[in-house]
């Protein structure tokens, strides 16, 4: 993979997480021309410059304008008359690299605090409540150089939201009581990351460079850095927050992006009105001209012990900041070649030796002044013994690039691919789009901000050679991550406790790498045959339907077809479910289905990589019902890739060496589940408890030893012997072509695997356990790795139907913001606090998910206390407030998909759940608008109140690593201080000791009836 892994080694810090479940022919450049009228804004002294020539894609119907305000804020305005949601983002070009040395995490803490009250809007949840009532949401993140705040809201309420948002940058309160509470949220956020290998490796990389360089700082912060130590040293953190904000939150370091239905003139006036008062303190842009890795930090080897059983090799070179060369992007060119996965590539050779499975190569962001070039691979057991040889191969490939010299045709191909990607770019969700653009405005001229990261302009062999010259053995840093180093390390990283050992790489090894010769196995990539050439948008057929239509229904297959009538891009989504009773019949078969598809994807990788580069990707997974295949992207060459995958499926020959390697990697991934987050464990156990048939990780591990090569070889024809295929073909494709695609898939399977249809009785889905009225069950487990508890509380309500769906969703809409405000902001139970619907197997209910240092039975009591307060809140709610919630939910539900793949995913969800309610949003919103407050109170009293006659509750308590035991229920009188609402006394729950016995004693719900009459659905 080229140019990647920025997340793995450079995670940003997202905050205020309301939801946890929470990178041809060039295009014709279209310019947004000057409007005919002279704006009233032209002579506005608050505006220094207006830029109306914003280069955009020819397919982009939105209007853009750039502004530079007199106070130095850069602005991009986007007028989109069709948008359901408006959005805005502000990016401050300051991050954790600018933290005071004695208060690590201050910039991140400042980001948290800005959400909690301003002079104009002092109520601490004013902003989040306003957004929640108007179908909005918000978030923010802090990285080394940026603090990025963003929100979305229903399009009518942009001004109200933007006014509240602007106050963050004008006059935040930094209220002392909020500060004392919110430090716990930051601490909980850090605690969540402490045992996460990505965060640990990122901090270790920072810690092993120049300790005086800002890069070495600890960016998240925790209670020790933001409260305990400052208190000991007599530092007032509130004063430091005020000082940090008044020093660095300067308009000359800010960039804003606003998207709304309003005209560009109206958006201009809005931004000028709200942001021209932000003070310009003329803060110099932080720059870091010295690289954190100097000579003494090079030619070093780091042996690192991970938390999970992973084996990775990270090879890093310090390189200069290439940002200014974005029009030629030499790092992209080298990443494209070094990270290539086709025949003759570095990865191809390392895989054939049995040393690695995956490779990522390319430039990685540092900060203004420095960057890195990385080549990262995962290691097989054999690969761990050949690290020196793997790195020698890397230098042989780099030597090949030097010997061949920069190739203009390779640059041209990258340029063409990027140009096609820009021309046919999917529309993005407003919130993500504004956040991304606000960050880019600091780096690129206003008129080129949309194109800068796509359109390559000049081939600069001199720059390619310059970067290539940095990729030498004398500049290398090597990190090996493996459990095999346990007990053999002598250093501990300060903030995460990572165990590691540092050694100088011996000079004879450096010499060996310097003498790397040319390896005849290495070849430059050949011309990419998957680059699309036909971009014709097919005319809508006369019988085109607004929703997927069933155009084929036989014993072998059901084919749903929908010609795109919204996005008009040369793309399609082809989704297939291959239903087989053999895929999940027991843990052994589940393992074999998984390994078959992993081996299949592994063998297809060289072929399919070129397609992926050309914007055509596929996904292949085993499911509890069989196999899922999707092919997405440009429709031009789609059938070629699909045919290759289907033929390979039906004629697959397993390579013995790859079988052993992939089986071993699978065993490690099963073992590594123990190190997942406590809240993820809670969700996993609940799924096992509630689903009729579900195999545990332990059962899969136990059965994996029985998977032998002969057994797997015998399983594949059995799996393919009888199938039922259900498909959705959606996009720039005709009905005739769709029927042809389906026929090709069937013919290939029949010809090569002699596939026959399944019996209708074999097509039944799994069902959900039905809890008894007034029943409350608790299941307890311990997480061996994390020192936090996790809980999922599930109130099962009923089968899915239009009415039940709306009762539940409206209740969830009403409690969502108060839940976050009460349990996270005020009570500080933890960083992860979530409430919302849970749906599985056609059954649904309300769920709460919390991760906390507090014990699970305490979290349970606080959720119950919160629910009681919500009963009163709903009873006291005005009709106007109630209607706001109905409106907010309606807007959320009717928010149109922004791209073909999102619309397709929605329809596919209806197909795999076998509900087929393609017009669900309109049908359910129409019902929603008939609901009254009394309906919701009745729903609560019948289903959710402590004494509700039809209350059905399951709680999963995941204990922290250091807790031996914990009561399942308890009273907490000492905790009930004046600020806490009283928790109700709870009955003694039934403790689940054995999952199988629990399920055996309870009935199952029936399956939901499909919404569609299949005879009528056929065209």
Curated annotation (Swiss-Prot):
Active site: 111
Residues reported to bind ATP: 429, 895-901
Recorded consequence of changing residue 111 to V: Abolishes catalytic activity. No effect on substrate binding
Reaction equation(s) it catalyzes: Degradation of insulin, glucagon and other polypeptides. No action on proteins
Main EC class the enzyme belongs to: hydrolase
Subcellular compartments: Cytoplasm, Cytosol; Cell membrane; Secreted
Tissue: Detected in brain (at protein level).
Modification sites for N6-succinyllysine: 192, 697
Residues holding Zn(2+): 108, 112, 189
Any one annotated GO CC term: mitochondrion
Main location, first listed in the record: cytoplasm
Amino-acid positions noted as binding substrate in the UniProt annotation, renumbered to this chain: 359-363
This protein's UniProt keywords: Allosteric enzyme, ATP-binding, Cell membrane, Cytoplasm, Hydrolase, Membrane, Metal-binding, Metalloprotease, Nucleotide-binding, Protease, Secreted, Zinc
Activity regulation, free text: Activated by ATP, other nucleotide triphosphates and small peptides. Inhibited by bacitracin.
Cofactor binding mode and count: Binds 1 zinc ion per subunit.
GO molecular function: amyloid-beta binding; ATP binding; ATP hydrolysis activity; beta-endorphin binding; endopeptidase activity; identical protein binding; insulin binding; metalloendopeptidase activity
Entries under InterPro entries matching the protein: Metalloenz_LuxS/M16, Pept_M16_N, Pept_M16_Zn_BS, Peptidase_M16, Peptidase_M16_C, Peptidase_M16_M, PqqF-like_C_4
Substitution effect: residue 898 to A: Greatly decreased activation by polyphosphate anions, and deficient in activation by small peptides
Motif SlyX motif, chain ranges: 853-858
Outcome reported for the amino acid change (mutating residue 609 to F): Strongly reduced catalytic activity. Abolishes stimulation of activity by ATP
Family note: Belongs to the peptidase M16 family.
Miscellaneous comment as given in the Swiss-Prot or TrEMBL entry: ATP-binding induces a conformation change.
UniProt function note: Plays a role in the cellular breakdown of insulin, APP peptides, IAPP peptides, natriuretic peptides, glucagon, bradykinin, kallidin, and other peptides, and thereby plays a role in intercellular peptide signaling. Substrate binding induces important conformation changes, making it possible to bind and degrade larger substrates, such as insulin. Contributes to the regulation of peptide hormone signaling cascades and regulation of blood glucose homeostasis via its role in the degradation of insulin, glucagon and IAPP.
Assembly and oligomerization: Homodimer. Can also form homotetramers.
Domain notes: The SlyX motif may be involved in the non-conventional secretion of the protein.
Protein's UniProt name: Insulin-degrading enzyme
Species, as recorded: Rattus norvegicus (Rat)
């Amino acid at each position: 993979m080229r140019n990647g892994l920025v997340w793995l080694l450079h995670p940003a810090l997202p905050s205020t997480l309301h939801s946890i479940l929470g990178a041809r022919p060039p295009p014709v450049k279209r310019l947004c021309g000057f409007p005919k009228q002279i704006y009233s804004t032209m002579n506005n002294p608050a505006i220094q410059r207006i830029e109306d020539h914003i280069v955009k894609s020819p397919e982009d119907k939105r209007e853009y304008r750039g502004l530079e305000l007199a106070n130095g804020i850069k602005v991009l305005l986007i007028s989109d008359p069709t948008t359901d949601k408006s959005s805005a983002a502000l990016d401050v070009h300051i991050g954790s690299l600018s933290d005071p040395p004695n208060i690590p995490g201050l910039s991140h803490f400042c980001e948290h605090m800005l959400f909690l009250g301003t002079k104009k809007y002092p109520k601490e949840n004013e902003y989040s409540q306003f957004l929640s009532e108007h179908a909005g949401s918000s978030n923010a993140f802090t990285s080394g150089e940026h603090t990025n705040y963003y929100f979305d809201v229903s399009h009518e309420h942009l001004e109200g939201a933007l006014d509240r948002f602007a106050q963050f940058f004008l006059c935040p309160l930094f209220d002392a009581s909020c500060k004392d509470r919110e430090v716990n949220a930051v601490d909980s956020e850090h605690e969540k990351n402490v045992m996460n290998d990505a965060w640990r490796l990122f901090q270790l990389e920072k810690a092993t460079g120049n300790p005086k360089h800002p890069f070495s700082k600890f960016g998240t912060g925790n209670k020790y850095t933001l409260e305990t130590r400052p208190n000991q040293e007599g530092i007032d953190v509130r004063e430091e927050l005020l000082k940090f904000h008044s020093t660095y939150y300067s308009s000359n370091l800010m960039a804003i992006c606003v998207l709304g239905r309003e005209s560009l003139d109206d958006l201009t006036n809005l931004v000028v009105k709200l942001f021209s008062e932000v003070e310009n303190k003329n803060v110099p842009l932080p720059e870091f001209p010295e690289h954190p890795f100097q000579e003494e930090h090079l030619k070093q080897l780091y042996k690192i012990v991970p938390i999970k059983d992973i084996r990775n090799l990270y090879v890093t070179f310090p390189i200069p900041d290439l940002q200014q060369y974005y029009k030629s992007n030499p790092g992209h060119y080298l990443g494209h070649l070094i990270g290539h996965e086709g025949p003759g590539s570095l990865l191809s050779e390392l895989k054939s030796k049995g040393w690695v499975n995956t490779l990522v190569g390319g430039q990685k962001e540092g900060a203004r002044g420095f960057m890195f070039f990385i080549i990262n691979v995962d290691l097989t057991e054999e690969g761990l013994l050949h690290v020196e040889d793997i790195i020698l191969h890397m230098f042989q490939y780099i030597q090949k690039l030097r010997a061949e010299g920069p190739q203009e045709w390779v640059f041209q191909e990258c340029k063409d691919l990027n140009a096609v990607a820009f021309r046919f770019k999917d529309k993005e969700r407003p919130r993500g789009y504004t956040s991304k653009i606000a960050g880019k405005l600091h780096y690129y001229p206003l008129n080129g901000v949309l194109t800068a990261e796509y359109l390559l302009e000049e081939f600069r062999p001199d720059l390619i050679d310059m970067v290539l010259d940095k990729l030498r053995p004398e500049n290398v840093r090597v990190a090996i991550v493996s459990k095999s180093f346990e007990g053999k390390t002598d250093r501990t990283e300060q903030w995460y406790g990572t165990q590691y050992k540092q050694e100088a790489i011996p000079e004879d090894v450096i010499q060996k790498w310097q003498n790397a010769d040319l390896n005849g196995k290495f070849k430059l990539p050949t011309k990419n045959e998957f680059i699309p050439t036909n971009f014709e948008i097919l005319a809508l057929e006369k019988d085109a339907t607004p929703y997927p239509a069933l155009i084929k229904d036989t014993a072998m297959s059901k084919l749903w077809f929908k010609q795109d009538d919204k996005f008009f891009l040369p793309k399609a989504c082809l989704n297939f479910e291959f239903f087989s009773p053999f895929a999940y019949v027991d843990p052994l078969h589940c393992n074999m289905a998984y390994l078959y598809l992993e081996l299949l994807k592994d063998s297809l990788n060289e072929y399919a990589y070129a397609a992926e580069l050309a914007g055509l990707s596929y996904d292949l997974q085993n499911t509890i019902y069989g196999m899922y295949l999707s092919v997405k992207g440009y429709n031009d060459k789609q059938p070629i890739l699909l045919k290759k995958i289907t033929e390979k499926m039906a004629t697959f020959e397993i390579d013995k060496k790859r079988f052993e390697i992939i089986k071993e990697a699978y065993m490690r991934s099963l073992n590594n589940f123990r190190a997942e987050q406590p809240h993820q464990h809670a969700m996993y156990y609940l799924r096992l408890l509630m689903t009729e048939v579900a195999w545990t990780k332990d059962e899969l591990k136990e059965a994996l030893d029985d998977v032998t090569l002969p057994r797997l070889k015998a399983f594949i024809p059995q799996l393919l012997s009888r199938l039922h295929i259900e498909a959705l073909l959606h996009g720039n494709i005709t009905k005739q072509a769709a029927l042809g695609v389906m026929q090709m898939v069937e013919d290939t399977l029949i010809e090569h695997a002699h596939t026959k249809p399944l019996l209708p009785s074999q097509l039944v889905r799994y069902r959900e356990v039905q809890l008894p009225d007034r029943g409350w069950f608790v299941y307890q487990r311990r997480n061996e790795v994390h020192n936090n508890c996790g809980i999922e509380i599930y109130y099962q309500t009923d089968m899915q139907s239009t009415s039940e769906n709306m009762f539940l969703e409206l209740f969830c809409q009403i409690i969502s913001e108060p839940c976050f405000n009460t349990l996270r902001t005020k009570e500080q139970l933890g960083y992860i606090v979530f409430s919302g619907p849970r749906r599985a197997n056609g059954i649904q209910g309300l769920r709460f998910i919390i991760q906390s240092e507090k014990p699970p039975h305490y979290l349970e009591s606080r959720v119950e206390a919160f629910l009681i307060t919500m009963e009163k809140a709903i009873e006291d709610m005005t009709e106007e407030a109630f209607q706001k919630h109905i409106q907010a939910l309606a807007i959320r539900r009717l928010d149109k998909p922004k791209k073909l793949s999102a619309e397709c995913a929605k329809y596919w969800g209806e197909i795999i759940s076998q509900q087929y309610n393609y017009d669900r949003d309109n049908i359910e919103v129409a019902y929603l608008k008939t609901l009254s407050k009394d309906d919701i109170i009745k729903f609560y009293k019948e289903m959710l109140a402590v004494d509700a006659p039809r209350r059905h509750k399951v709680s999963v308590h995941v204990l922290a690593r250091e807790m031996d035991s914990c009561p399942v229920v308890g009273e907490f009188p000492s905790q009930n201080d004046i600020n806490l609402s009283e928790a109700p006394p709870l009955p003694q729950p039934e403790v689940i000791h054995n999952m199988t016995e629990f399920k055996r004693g309870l009935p199952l719900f029936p399956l939901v009836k499909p919404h569609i009459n299949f005879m009528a659905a056929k065209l």
